[in-house]
Amino acid sequence: MQIRVPQRNRGRTFPHRSSHRRTPIHILEFLAAQPLLTLALILAVGLLIGKIRFFGISLGAAAVLFVALALSTVDPALQLPPLVYQLGLAMFVYAIGLSAGSEFFAEFRHRGWKLTLFMIGLLMLMMAVAYGIIKLFGLDEIIGAGMFAGALSSTPGMAAMVEMLEGIDDSVASEPVVGYSLAYPGAVIGSILVAAIGAKLMKVNHAADAAEEGLVSDPLEWTGVRIGPGINGTIAQLPTLAGEEIIATRVVHSKTFHSLAAPNDRLHEGMVLVIHGTPDALERAIAKVGKQQDVPIEDTDLVYSRFTVSSKAVVGRKISDLDTVRSGFIISRLRRGDADVVPEPDDVLHYSDRVRVIAPANRMSEVRRFLGDSERSLADVDLMPFAFGLVIGLAIGVIPIPLPGGNTLSLGFGGGPIVAGLILGALNRTGPIHWQMPYHASRTISTFGLAIFLAGVGTSAGVGFRQALTDPASLTVIAGGFIVTISSALVCALVCMPLFKLKWDEAMGVAAGCTTNPAIISYLNGQTGTELATRGYATVYPTAMIGKIIASQMLLLALIA
């Protein structure tokens, strides 16, 4: 006796079981009907595998992509709604833009514009390489154009080609997706292989490179200095006079009487100050402005303490605008993330910054209230600015940009949010709106956005990858895309290191920025433990994102012309 299962299992038969036992349902079919459970499972398994080290290398969040790809290859019905990866990518790139905004525009004025021009040239070169591969191997033109987008991880570029083809021949509008799906996994694997193998062969010292670039500071110390003859100016001008990143915090009048070093106080011969900086900076500064002086600080009425910045009245403002001396304290050290740095007057305070302050003991409670120092306030994150910023970014993403021939393109859900994030991150605040978020909240949102993006895009690529297992022609598309990916990463290393004097990690960050692939930058950050790769990534990401949308459509037009 057999029981037929209705509706979606119609036509399939199962052996009769006892009435008290439920009819078994295939686990993959069950997951296909439960996308939320599927998403959670992919995230859990992927993040678990990402912690495992293979030959000293761990994939981190990138493992989520491969778990999603594996599941959807076994059963193409395992698809997550497009909204999942669209929202994930938008959250990730917007958070990246917020954190990198100030540095991006500051860097652009120095060498950022050079890297922007390099990225434009690189995309043109890769477009030519892809064109040659398609013609040499006789690949289908439309699938080949999709291969180019997949090899450089350009989901917006692929979407732009689909939209363009819908206006030309709707019957082939889905073919770029096939090429994209086949090439996309190789884009992740290829870039990670170049970064990992290159770092091993070149014996890259990640921490030393980051320190040389000023991204990892030596521990800060303090010492006393007696100002020598011929040193004229104010305390605020002392770093300039010394030519070093130092800060004066105390004027020493006697063993028991110290006062705060006000910026407008005049320097004079014999004046004794307490200054802070790295050991090397202190040594060089003292040699220029005077001589070292032993200063006991235990028996004075000035004390020091660390507070966390959480006050809305302080966040987003420059230290110089706070007039801290009038409020009874001086900020001697600024800790953001894992690094202590000497604060500068133009530094803008962010949520969750840790500051070391010096103040009279009887005013320390007042200083605490001024800065906030409330973990509860930081945990109560105001998501309104983040949501409003996403709205601005997504709105920018849908604005049509006209092209010759009557075609249009848009920045999409990946390009628009990063443009908005960079601008708003550089602004810090607009009136009462604080665009920046607490450090931990920003990292959590960006990591979660990255993970759900990888889960969503991984399941969408499974159909094409499954075809490759049975169609030899698909293997040619995979190989062609892999060549484009490897070529772009190698060009970044071979050009950026000698021409722009970039370290290996930053050059690989530029390569990751070329692919605009969050999985690659996640891997690089996990392996290096520094911000070098992120700096390179953020510098070229906007140009690469926009450039690939244009390049993908230009390649398609060149192939079908």
UniProtKB/Swiss-Prot annotation:
Topology versus the membrane: Multi-pass membrane protein
GO cellular component: plasma membrane
Keyword annotations: Cell membrane, Membrane, Transmembrane, Transmembrane helix, Transport
Main localization (coarse): membrane
Membrane recorded as keyword: yes
SUPFAM superfamilies referenced in this protein's UniProt entry, alphabetically: TrkA C-terminal domain-like
InterPro entries: AAE_transporter, RCK_C, RCK_C_sf, Transaldolase_AS, YidE_YbjL
Taxonomy, superkingdom: Bacteria
GO BP of this protein: carbohydrate metabolic process; potassium ion transport
Gene Ontology MF, one: monoatomic cation transmembrane transporter activity
Residues in RCK C-terminal domain copies: 292-373
Ranges annotated as spanning the membrane: 27-49, 54-71, 83-105, 115-137, 142-162, 177-199, 383-405, 409-428, 441-463, 478-500
Intracellular or extracellular location(s): Cell membrane
Family: Belongs to the AAE transporter (TC 2.A.81) family.
Name by which UniProt lists this protein: Uncharacterized transporter DIP0570
Lineage: Bacteria, Bacillati, Actinomycetota, Actinomycetes, Mycobacteriales
